[in-house]
């Protein structure tokens, strides 16, 4: 029997939360439903928990688990799992978030009516214990996104606003990811890439004004900022900046390459934004791994204010940078 929707739960190193996330996936009211539990080669017990829960499941959904042989990153993971999916619509769930029972139903019904290239929804914020922190949160629209794509007259707009898709609450037609070429290496910022491609194709992103997931806020999340001012906290924040910067370079390269492969009509101003973003990643990545001379050489790569704002306080070493940060944040 064919299924119209696949709910894919993707996880990496989430053994403390994945069981609860899977339980919420299995509790979906939509039927017939395929559920794929997919692990990105976690070194912890994430995949073992997936296998255990598939083995013990007795219910109406078609459920199976898969594992990447090596860690491939979010974009390749979504490409692979979409190629394996049977549903026309692929609903994405993270291994530490909770999908509410009617999530798949609500997304599928809205998508069947609109034909959007991506779906998303409001969400509730929960802590690591599952305690409610905030209800009915709409992921904010980015003023920067509006500036980046301002010249794209064919971009789909909702009351004049260009929508983006928050990856943690997203759903896509299976073909969106399945038809992409494999990226040359691991990419993590899948929602930035997806939003850019959908906008440049002139397709629609639809957000449902109701909470369909419990989005878990964790200290280690890429979307949660650490605010401590101790040396250890500052070093940790710098590591996260470096991590994001490396990914930014790879994602922008893949995006620019895909725009070229598809022959999309992109305004020169938009392409300038893309290239400046890639350059910013090159300016900020691996900064503390290079020597003092190489740090000063990066001054010649400054293209935008954000490049200078990153470089200037860091040029004279980490100790002075940490002292300045503590001084001006008090």
PLM region spans:
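C-terminal subregions of glycosyltransferases and related glycan-biosynthesis enzymes
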Residues: 156-160, 166, 187-188, 192-193, ...
């Amino acid at each position: 029997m064919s299924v119209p929707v696949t709910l894919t739960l993707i996880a990496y190193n989430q053994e403390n939360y994945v069981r609860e996330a899977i339980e919420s996936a299995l509790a979906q009211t939509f039927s017939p439903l395929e559920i794929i539990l997919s692990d990105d080669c976690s070194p912890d017990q994430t995949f073992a928990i997936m296998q255990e829960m598939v083995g013990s499941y007795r219910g109406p959904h078609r459920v199976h688990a898969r594992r990447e042989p090596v860690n491939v990153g979010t974009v390749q993971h979504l490409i692979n799992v979409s190629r394996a999916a049977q549903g026309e619509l692929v609903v994405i769930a993270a291994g530490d978030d909770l999908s509410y029972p009617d999530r798949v139903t609500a997304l599928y019904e809205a998508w069947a009516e609109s034909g959007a290239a991506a779906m998303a929804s409001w969400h509730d914020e929960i802590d690591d214990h599952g305690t409610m922190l905030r209800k009915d949160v709409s992921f904010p629209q980015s003023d920067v996104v509006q500036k980046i794509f301002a010249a794209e007259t064919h971009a789909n707009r909702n009351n004049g606003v260009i929508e983006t898709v928050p990856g943690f609450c997203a759903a896509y037609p299976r073909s969106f990811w399945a038809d992409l070429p494999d990226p040359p290496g691991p990419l993590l910022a899948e929602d930035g890439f997806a939003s850019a491609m959908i906008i440049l194709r002139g397709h629609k992103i639809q957000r449902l004004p109701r909470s369909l997931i419990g989005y878990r806020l964790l200290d280690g999340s890429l979307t949660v900022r650490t605010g401590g001012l101790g040396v250890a906290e500052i070093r940790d924040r710098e590591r996260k900046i470096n991590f994001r910067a490396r990914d930014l370079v790879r994602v922008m390269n893949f995006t620019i390459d895909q725009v070229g492969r598809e022959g999309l009509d992109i305004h020169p101003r938009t392409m300038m934004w893309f290239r400046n973003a890639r350059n910013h990643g090159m300016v900020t990545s691996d900064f503390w791994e290079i020597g003092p001379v190489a740090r000063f050489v990066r001054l010649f790569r400054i293209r935008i204010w954000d490049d200078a704002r990153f470089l200037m306080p860091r040029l004279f070493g980490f100790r002075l940078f940490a002292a300045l940060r503590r001084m001006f944040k008090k």
